[in-house]
C-alpha cells in the first residue's frame, strides 16, 4: 500500500509476471484443487471432518492463483514481445485462462461438497459416506489425466480423457441412483450434482486439450 485515506487505497503491484510462466501457475492451481477434491472424498470414506477444515482458505488461494493467471494473460496479450521472451505463445496464454477458470470452479464445488460432507458425517450417514468416498479415486485420476493432456497438447490423450469423463459421469449418476435416501437426502443430492459437475468440468479441460492439439497439428 503506497497511499491510503478514508475513501481510497492505492496499491503497487510488485509481482514480476516474467518469473513464472502461466503453465506453472496452472500446475499449482491444479495441485491445490486436486487436494481439495481428494480430501472431500477421503473425509467421507474415513468419516473425518478434520480433513475438511480450512477448505475455504484453500479456495481463497485457488482464487488468488486464478486472478494471477488472468492478470498475467492481460499483460502478455498486450505485449507480444514479452510473451515471446518467456517462450509462451498467445494461444497458450488464452488457454491458460480457460483452464484456470475451470479449475477455480472445481474448487468452488469442493468447498460446497465439504460443507455437505460434514453434514452427512455428523448425521452418522456411514453407508452413504462410504459410497460417496469410493468415487474419489476415479474423479481425481480423471482430473490428473485431463490436465496432463492439456499440458502436453496430447490429442490421443485428450480423446481418451473425453471418453473417460463420459464414463465417469455415467458411473456417478448410476452410483447415486442406487443410494438409499434417508433424512440426509438433501446433502446427498448436492453431492450428486457436484460430483457430476466435477466430471463435466474435467471433460471441458479435455476438450480444450483436444482443440489445442488440433490447432497445432
Each predicted region: which residue ranges?
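Cytosolic, long alpha-helical scaffolding segments
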Residues: 1-217
Amino acid at each position: 500500500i503506497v497511499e491510503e485515506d478514508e475513501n481510497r487505497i492505492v496499491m503497487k503491484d510488485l509481482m514480476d509476471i516474467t518469473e513464472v510462466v502461466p503453465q506453472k501457475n496452472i500446475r499449482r492451481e491444479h495441485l491445490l484443487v486436486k487436494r481439495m477434491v481428494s480430501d472431500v472424498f477421503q473425509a467421507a470414506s474415513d468419516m473425518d471432518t478434520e480433513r475438511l477444515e480450512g477448505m475455504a482458505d484453500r479456495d481463497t488461494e485457488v482464487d488468488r492463483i486464478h486472478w494471477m493467471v488472468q492478470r498475467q494473460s492481460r499483460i502478455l496479450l498486450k505485449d507480444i514481445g514479452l510473451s515471446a521472451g518467456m517462450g509462451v505463445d498467445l494461444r497458450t496464454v488464452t488457454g491458460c485462462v480457460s483452464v484456470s477458470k475451470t479449475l477455480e470452479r472445481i474448487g468452488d464445488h469442493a468447498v460446497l461438497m465439504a460443507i455437505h460432507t460434514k453434514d452427512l458425517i455428523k448425521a452418522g450417514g456411514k453407508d452413504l459416506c462410504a459410497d460417496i468416498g469410493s468415487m474419489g479415486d476415479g474423479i481425481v485420476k480423471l482430473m490428473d489425466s485431463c490436465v496432463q493432456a492439456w499440458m502436453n497438447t496430447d490429442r490421443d490423450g485428450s480423446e481418451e480423457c473425453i471418453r473417460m469423463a463420459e464414463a465417469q459421469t455415467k458411473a456417478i449418476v448410476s452410483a447415486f441412483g442406487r443410494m438409499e435416501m434417508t433424512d440426509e437426502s438433501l446433502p446427498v443430492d448436492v453431492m450428486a450434482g457436484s460430483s457430476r459437475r466435477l466430471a463435466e468440468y474435467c471433460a471441458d479441460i479435455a476438450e480444450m486439450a483436444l482443440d489445442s492439439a488440433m490447432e497445432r497439428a
